[in-house]
Structure formats: structure tokens, C-alpha cells
């Protein structure tokens, strides 16, 4: 069985500046890894390269997910293949409630998989059960996505979104930043 994610001798640059210089990493299904290092060491660059963000160029090496190279895939294709990137600073979405956002994301995935959309009442029960474990209350779920949220609230909501992701590989940038011990 192929590793979930395999990075082979990855070199990448931003403009004319080389950032990643020969990264090798193998992650098997079910494993949890932490990428740590000082500021400017390439952690964010690696996540952006994995997600296929514009402006980041792979100059050598390969990225394989379940044995398939991702280098020629656009970012949306990488997401459909199983890549999930939770950004350090999630954007605010004024006018879009958290519950509506989560349900739209779940239903988009269900439709793509040929499944029926989830019933609203069933979804509310599911969200409340998952959110409870993250100390997220109904008020937070009704608020516009990330609007006026503290750093800890934003991160708690990132974990909530992550819990609804069916992606096989999740890359969370600074996942504990701003979180209180109760989260």
C-alpha cells in the first residue's frame, strides 16, 4: 500500500528565492506529524506548495498522494484528491453564517460523491454534537464565519470545519495558536 503522502527531494521557490531545498517526508495513513522549525524555515511554503497555491514553484522533486503525483494538479483537483489545508488566518465571510457554511461544504461534497444532500435538522444535530467537543456553542455557529472572532474562536472553528472534512490528508497551519485549554 502506498503512503498517504510522500514528498521526494522537494525543492521549491517563490520568485527567484529558493525556499525548500530537498525535503523528504513519508506519512502513512493514520499517522500524525508535526512540522516544526524557526520562522522563515519553510513551513508555510511547504503547506502552500502541497496545496498548489499560485506563486510557489516546484523546481525539483515530487509530491505523491496515495502514489499519484500531485505536481500537475490544480489546487481544486488536489482538494478533491484528498488535500485539506486550514490556513493560519482564515478569511472573514460577512453575511455567511457558520452553520450554513458548514452545511454547504458538506452538501457540495455529498453531491460530488453522488449522495443526497443532508437534511437540515439532521445536520444541525450532527454539528451540535461535533461542536460540543470543541466548546463551540450555537451562538458561534450562527455568527458570520470568522467575523469578529477571537484568535481562539477562529481556531476552534477551524477544527470544527476540519471535523467535517472528508479529506484524507489535513495540513493545519499553527493549529493551537490562540486556543484556550478548554478547546
Residue ranges and their predicted role:
Residues 5-7, 20:
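Conserved structural motif at the start of ABC-family nucleotide-binding domains
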Residues 17-20, 77:
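Short coil-to-beta microelement around the adenine-binding A-loop and adjacent beta1/P-loop entry
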Residues 36-38:
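The feature captures the beta-strand-to-loop junction immediately N-terminal to the Walker
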Residues 46, 158-160, 179:
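Hydrophobic anchor residue at the start of the ABC signature
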Residues 62-78, 146:
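ABC ATPase NBD Q-loop/coupling interface
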Residues 91-168:
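ABC-family P-loop ATPase nucleotide-binding domains
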Residues 170-174, 179:
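Catalytic Walker B motif of ABC-type/P-loop ATPase nucleotide-binding domains
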Amino acid at each position: 500500500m502506498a503512503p498517504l503522502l510522500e514528498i521526494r527531494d522537494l525543492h521549491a521557490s517563490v520568485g527567484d528565492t529558493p525556499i525548500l531545498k530537498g525535503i523528504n517526508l513519508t506519512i502513512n495513513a493514520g499517522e500524525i506529524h508535526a512540522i516544526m522549525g524557526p520562522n522563515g524555515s519553510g513551513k508555510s511554503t511547504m503547506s502552500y506548495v502541497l496545496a498548489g497555491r499560485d506563486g510557489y514553484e516546484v523546481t525539483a522533486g515530487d509530491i505523491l498522494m496515495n502514489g499519484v503525483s500531485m505536481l500537475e494538479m490544480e489546487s481544486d483537483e488536489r482538494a478533491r484528491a484528498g488535500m485539506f489545508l486550514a490556513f493560519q488566518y482564515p478569511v472573514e465571510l460577512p453575511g455567511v453564517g457558520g452553520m450554513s457554511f458548514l452545511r454547504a461544504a458538506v452538501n457540495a461534497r455529498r453531491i460530488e460523491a453522488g449522495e443526497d444532500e443532508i437534511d437540515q435538522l439532521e445536520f444541525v444535530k450532527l454539528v451540535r454534537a461535533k461542536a460540543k467537543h470543541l466548546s463551540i456553542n450555537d451562538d458561534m455557529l450562527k455568527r458570520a464565519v470568522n467575523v469578529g472572532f477571537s484568535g481562539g474562536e477562529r481556531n476552534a472553528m477551524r477544527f470544527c470545519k476540519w471535523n467535517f472534512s472528508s479529506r484524507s490528508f489535513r495540513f493545519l497551519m499553527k493549529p493551537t495558536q490562540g486556543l484556550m485549554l478548554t478547546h
